[in-house]
Amino acid sequence: MAGVGIRSYACHRQTRRLLDGDVLMSPGPGNTDMPQTKSSPIAHPYPGRLITLDGIDGVGKSSQIEILAERLRSEGRNVLCVRDPGSTDLGTKLRAMLLDSDLEMHRRTEAMLFMASRCEMIESTLRSALADGVTVISDRFLLANVVYQSVGGEVDAQTLWQLGRLACGGVQPDVTLLLDLPAEISMQRVGGEADRMESRGVDYMAKVRQAFLDELPNAGGRTHVIDASGTIEEVAETIAAIELF
């Protein structure tokens, strides 16, 4: 699979240090010494698994979530797919507001609406699913909230992490898969369908991409950066090589 693969956030030496700092080795085809990060030994106290996919717009999260869910179900796992924001009545309404290109709001306002949507999703759906042993795959989670609302400087990332942990009530991802793509390619893929955040332009998206890489170590659980520039099938093969359980 030329040009497609997993790389560690550790390649970005300018990023902040790990929380709790340990680096795990996760061997795979052609990646026998591939670093894998873990910023917290316990993601949540439940038997289920929370896997999140994230990245800038246009990286192909939706396609990869569908493929991953189908593969895990074929292995006999009970899988629930959610999206953040969304997946509840309140979340769906908040999502429409947050992505409305005609609606302007302060970054703190954005941050609080995202937090409210995530809190509702956790308390109405995720917590009980994880307690029942379900594998939950989430399209975005707290990492995206921190990244998008901190870029621009109106709200600092540390404050957002603190607020986010409170809103999540002890639930954080077991595994975060960050699909990475240059901002220029992202904007080409999005095309003329840009929402309110995407419409801020390629320079903004480049800052968002770097912020994802910088903040990834703080996401909790194990984290992987995946090259999303290949075909859907190539990226899916890369994800399939990762140990998720």
Curated annotation (Swiss-Prot):
A GO cellular-component term linked to this record: cytoplasm
GO biological process: dTDP biosynthetic process; dTTP biosynthetic process; dUDP biosynthetic process
Cysteine disulfide links: none
Gene behind this protein: tmk
Keyword ATP-binding: yes
Enzyme's top EC category: transferase
Keywords linked to the UniProt accession: ATP-binding, Kinase, Nucleotide biosynthesis, Nucleotide-binding, Transferase
Protein's UniProt keywords contain Transmembrane: no
Residues that, per the record, bind ATP: G55, I56, D57, G58, V59, G60, K61, S62
Record SUPFAM superfamilies: P-loop containing nucleoside triphosphate hydrolases (SSF52540)
InterPro entries attached to this UniProt entry: P-loop_NTPase, Thymidylate_kin-like_dom, Thymidylate_kinase
GO-annotated molecular function: ATP binding; dTMP kinase activity
Reaction catalysis annotation: dTMP + ATP = dTDP + ADP
Name of the protein this chain belongs to: Thymidylate kinase
Alphabetical list of NCBIfam families matching this protein: DTMP_kinase
Functional summary from the UniProt entry: Phosphorylation of dTMP to form dTDP in both de novo and salvage pathways of dTTP synthesis.
Family label: Belongs to the thymidylate kinase family.
Protein EC: 2.7.4.9
PANTHER family: THYMIDYLATE KINASE (PTHR10344), UMP-CMP KINASE 2, MITOCHONDRIAL (PTHR10344:SF4)
